[in-house]
Structure formats: C-alpha cells, structure tokens
C-alpha cells in the first residue's frame, strides 16, 4: 500500500470535477485500505454520490474564508490535520500551486497533473499546427495516481453502479423515459469564453437533434447573463 491517506485536489470547474469521478472511484476501489480525501468546492462536492467508503469529500471555500494566500494557508493547515501523507493535484492552477508549496514545505509527497498545455497550443496554433492525438483528461488524471504508486484498472460503470438513477428525482421535470427513447443533455455555456462552442452552431446542433424521432433534449447550465 503506497500511502495511508491521499489528498486529491480539483477545485473547479464543475465538468472537470465530474470527469475525475471515474478515475477517483476506480482508484478508491483498487486500494480499499487507503483513505482518499477529495478537496473541491461546495457546488462540486454534491457530485460524489454513492462514493466508495474510503472516499471523503472536503469543501474548500475559496471565495470566503479560504480566499487569497492567507486563506489557502489556513486551508492547507486544516487539511494537514487529517494526517495527509500524499497529494494528487488534478488541477494545477495558481491556488493549487500555493497549496502544493505548503505541503512540500511540510515534507508531504506531491504529484501534479500534466495538462499538456504545450501540446494543446501546438494543436490549436494557426501557424505550424501540430496534428497529433492528445491524451484524454481521464488518462492524465490516472497518471497522477500512478506516479504516486497506485496502479489500477479503470472499472467505473456508473454513479449508480450497475443500476439506474431514481426516476422520482426528476418526476416534476419530465415523464419517465420510455422504451427506445434517447435523452441528450446539452450544456452550451462555460465560465471561460474560449470553451464555449459558437452559439449559432450549437443552436443548429440542438435543432437537428430535436428533429430526430424519440429524442428528448435537456438544456443545462444557463446563468443570469445567459438567460437574458
């Protein structure tokens, strides 16, 4: 067993935190004797349903009491009291770099994701574009754990394991899914403009999907500005 208690950091955004779940749940189940602590923001903490018993979720209030350098120092101290002996940074932004600084100062082993920023810049460059397959976020998340000594085979199936979700949770929104019907969720907006698919094209995508028989479209993610 490589470590007894591992801190996992992914503060935002919601979709990126959601993408950690298949990897995190798989690692937790592969190493039941290790406790994993997921550090994320409150809104994202609600994603971790039916979690493995050895996964604990801790909320970071980065816009409140954990804001700024001093706030992050207090956050690092709070987490340190949980007897963390290794850190898996799945975010690699300024906030997590500050946290990593404190953990390294205290002699705690740290592993950080390689986001492949250089490769992505080469792929999206207007000139001298380098066309080559890039590793997925799932692969990059997994590599962080492997670097800490956690070898595992991804075995995540669903948040509901082999079953399905409770239809009663959305009974006020729509009728139960009928046999042969396909449900497609579309979240057209993002916090960063560069991550938003052009709205005119997205409208075309939704329009074409809605014309297919036995397809129901669900739109998600609109804030106040988008609703206007």
Task: For every predicted segment, state its role.
Residues 1-228:
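Catalytic machinery of carbohydrate-active enzymes
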